[in-house]
């Protein structure tokens, strides 16, 4: 046993949350609608698992108000947000009633029955094909059945408990972004909802 192994101690939960706040993540609205009810929450714990077949991973706290509807419906939509979506991200990330959350955006119903935000950067229509409990959360494995990319805004990120924006990369041959536009990505705006990396409303 090495000296570092013998000195190892459990990581404090608060220290872990603080460390995770340093990770910049895309911001998503996870929505569902169906026999289990309509629900949605803001999340950053989303990532790709595979492209063969296309599969996403979504994490949700089992105490989330959206948990029952999401697991009963068995379907969801991952809506990736852009600049200008800070308000709706805050509504879905707090304790706002469901009707007020969905009143903040314009939606269209997908094949699965889930609702897609019409101006999201991209929306993934998904069916939940697997679920695994880890600590306080469930890890959902979601088969992607359709993709719609419509939004043209800069990407919305969440880092150090603040929203930030990341300018879109210029097209090949296009002029570089204006300095002021690039600098804006380094600015921070206070988040309207709770920390997203570890908690879901």
From Swiss-Prot:
SMART domains in UniProt: Flavin_Reduct (SM00903)
One Pfam family recorded for the sequence: Flavin_Reduct
InterPro entries xrefs: Flavin_Rdtase-like_dom (IPR002563), NADH-dep_flavin_reductase (IPR050268), RutF (IPR019917), Split_barrel_FMN-bd (IPR012349)
Region spans: Disordered: 169-201
Catalytic activity: FMNH2 + NAD(+) = FMN + NADH + 2 H(+)
Enzyme Commission number(s) of this protein: 1.5.1.42
HAMAP family for the chain: RutF
Protein's name according to its UniProt entry: FMN reductase (NADH) RutF
Source organism of the structure: Methylorubrum extorquens (strain ATCC 14718 / DSM 1338 / JCM 2805 / NCIMB 9133 / AM1)
